[in-house]
Amino acid sequence: MSDPVVRLRELRRSFSQGGVTIDVLRGVNLEIRPGEIVALLGPSGSGKSTMLQAIGLLEGGFSGLIEIAGTDASKLSGDDRTALRRDHLGFVYQFHHLLPDFNAIENVVLPQLVAGTDRAVAEARAAELLSALGLAKRLDHRPSQLSGGEQQRVAVARALANRPEMVLADEPTGNLDEATADRVLEEFLKLVRGEGSAALIATHNERLALRMDRVVRLHEGVLE
Ligand SMILES: Nc1ncnc2c1ncn2[C@@H]1O[C@H](COP(=O)(O)OP(=O)(O)OP(=O)(O)O)[C@@H](O)[C@H]1O
């Protein structure tokens, strides 16, 4: 078996609020294999976003092991963490966070330029991804000229642009109506599978979770 893309061992995180400490993650263990698509379920406030932030190396304050593509992130400096994130991870959020002044294709090209990809190669890759998501005729549209589902598709293309081994998605279809959410998730999963990326997708939707390879649940700070 190949090495996991993500390995968590005894991941812990507490927050202090008004003098009270809450232990949100109380020893989370998880391994995700290359290409595996995992649904992360759990009630509101159970710590799904906190867990994704840990794996995404976006926040500090965690204890335990966070290993990305075989590298122990806790041993890295800030710059090296940024490089590890950029080289291996892609992100999709509930709200797309697209750059409002750039059109669809530029939103997918820019992260590739940041990663050092040649512009012509980046443009071809962006056009291919957006076309696979049905947006071939929307390449020059700015986010404000796109529907909510189309905006989220651009965000999916952006997350995959640098060929991440792992996509982290936090309620990626949570702000869409049910029919659109189903369609966007379907396309997202198809594209992720086609690319061979792994994914960890936090969702409240049990029905959509059943379309993934494995379901894990956060309950009282641990995965079950
Ligand atoms: N920066 C913070 N400071 C204090 N408390 C926090 C912070 N971030 C998260 N929390 C608390 O940690 C708990 C878990 O939050 P988190 O957002 O991870 O849950 P979630 O499962 O993603 O919820 P939802 O499904 O509603 O998005 C909540 O009680 C929240 O209030």
Swiss-Prot record:
Domain ABC transporter: start-end pairs: 6-224
Residues the record lists as binding ATP: G42, P43, S44, G45, S46, G47, K48, S49
One Gene Ontology biological process: lipoprotein localization to outer membrane
Membrane topology (UniProt): Peripheral membrane protein
InterPro entries registered for this protein in UniProt: AAA+_ATPase, ABC_transporter-like_ATP-bd, ABC_transporter-like_CS, ABC_transpr_LolD-like, MacB-like_ATP-bd, P-loop_NTPase
Main location: membrane
SUPFAM superfamilies cross-referenced by the UniProt entry: P-loop containing nucleoside triphosphate hydrolases (SSF52540)
Key words of the record: ATP-binding, Cell inner membrane, Cell membrane, Membrane, Nucleotide-binding, Translocase, Transport
CDD domains documented for this protein: ABC_MJ0796_LolCDE_FtsE
E.C. numbers: 7.6.2.-
Domain of life: Bacteria
Gene Ontology MF terms: ATP binding; ATP hydrolysis activity; transmembrane transporter activity
Classification via Pfam families: ABC_tran
UniProt subcellular location: Cell inner membrane
Coiled coil: none
PANTHER family: IMPORT ATP-BINDING PROTEIN (PTHR24220), LIPOPROTEIN-RELEASING SYSTEM ATP-BINDING PROTEIN LOLD (PTHR24220:SF689)
Function: Part of the ABC transporter complex LolCDE involved in the translocation of mature outer membrane-directed lipoproteins, from the inner membrane to the periplasmic chaperone, LolA. Responsible for the formation of the LolA-lipoprotein complex in an ATP-dependent manner.
Family: Belongs to the ABC transporter superfamily. Lipoprotein translocase (TC 3.A.1.125) family.
Annotated protein name in UniProt: Lipoprotein-releasing system ATP-binding protein LolD
Gene designation per UniProt: lolD
